[in-house]
Amino acid sequence: MMKQQKVASVATILKRELQPTIKEWLRRGNLVPELTDVPLSDTDRNAHLPKLYADLICRLRLAKDTHPPVSIAAAAHGKIRREQGYSASMLIEESRIFQVSTFSTLHVHQSELDPAKLLSDVMVIADEVDA
């Protein structure tokens, strides 16, 4: 008799895998010369991520027809980055890395995810990153 694997939500996986996902984001970010040209410590470079992921996880757990709240953390992060010397294109690159790191985590754990809900959650992630 086969053991049935427990299905987890995207929000659950992202919450559980927060630290490895942030570590992957930092690794990818440190490979982009445009970003590393601004001298920041690893802590300064990724301090915004726990709150951004908390906002994303909260949004993933909302009912699908609920109007999403505005991410105050994302706006604050943009302001801080501007003060640190980031350009708009650098912020876009950070957002792209956020999305790729998030999807990489989901890919690693895809066997735990409900395929019927995955695509709609990916759409929420893409919308949140683009907001």
Listing of model-derived features with the role each one plays in the protein:
Residues 4, 8-16, 20, 28, ...:
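N-terminal intrinsically disordered, cationic/polar leader segments
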Residues 32-34, 39, 104, 109:
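Generic alpha-helical propensity signal that fires on short helical segments
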Residues 4, 24-25, 32, 49, ...:
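Alpha-helical/coil-rich non-catalytic "connector" segments in signaling and regulatory proteins
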Residues 2-15, 64-131:
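Long, amphipathic alpha-helical coupling/dimerization segments that relay conformational signals between
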Residues 25-29, 49, 53-56, 99, ...:
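Hydrophobic alpha-helical core bundles mediating ligand binding, dimerization, or RNAP-core interactions
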Residues 37-57:
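Amphipathic alpha-helical segments that form the core helices of the histone-fold
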